[in-house]
Amino acid sequence: MATGRNTTGVLADSLDTIVASARARREYEAVVPQLVDRVDLSPHSGLSWKEIMFAKLSAQAITEQTVLDNPQLFDDTAITITPQMVQIQTFITDKTGRNLSTKSLAQMGKLAGNAMMRKRDEDGLTALDGSTTQLGTIGTPIVTGDIAAARYRITSNATEPGNLPISGVFHGYVIKDMYDELAAGIGSYPVPEGATAQVFKGGFNLPIAQVSIHEDGNITIDSNADAKGFVFAKEAWVLVNGMTLKTETRREPHIGGGGE
């Protein structure tokens, strides 16, 4: 008969491995869908959302002697947006569902929703990447003047001005450049309470020329260590919701002993 002290190493076969906790990998919140106009495509109204935009009319000066015979034509243009469908599929065998930790199963349940929200944000960023005007240069840190310039290009645009609110969406690394610009004097001269002190203590969350700044880590950093940022009026972009989010379960008894 063996003798000695009983330790966990001696009784390793009797120890169970228990999942104490589980968590999903953290993701960035969907930023862009929250900052644009959102409309719903009504049921039984076709595949596309359609809006009619009318061009400006011209008025003219007259006198008391004027016999006005210059009718203006209305010029209409159709803006058509067709929503794209997004879907995700998972399959869990009955054996997996029976034997997996309930803590793990609870986390797995929300991953599909996270993926859908991330896809919406990435699609929004792709659309914004088609913006017509580019400010700044490759390899050069952004300055707050670029954001102010973009803001006034929007609100004073000669073709059609954009109205407030105006948002700026940037990668956090780019927002750090804004922080550096505003906090550059710290250590060189006294910093009284104000914008600089506020940013130094709480991070860069100030508006710039009425542009609200938002961090979105889903923005891609390219091979030059650059990340694009976007400044836009809310009404410039329309997110059309077609089918509402839904979940469905289909039994597959012939796969792996059954699953869904």
Model-assigned labels for residue ranges:
Residues 53, 155-247:
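Extended oligomerization regions of viral-like shell subunits
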Residues 1-34, 38, 204-207, 220, ...:
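Protruding loop/beta-arch "assembly-hinge" segments enriched in small, turn-prone residues
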Residues 1-81:
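N-terminal "assembly arms/tails" that initiate or stabilize quaternary assembly
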Residues 93-164:
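Alpha-helical scaffold segments that mediate packing/assembly in large oligomeric complexes
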Residues 46-48, 87, 165, 169, ...:
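Broad gene-expression machinery/nucleic-acid interaction feature
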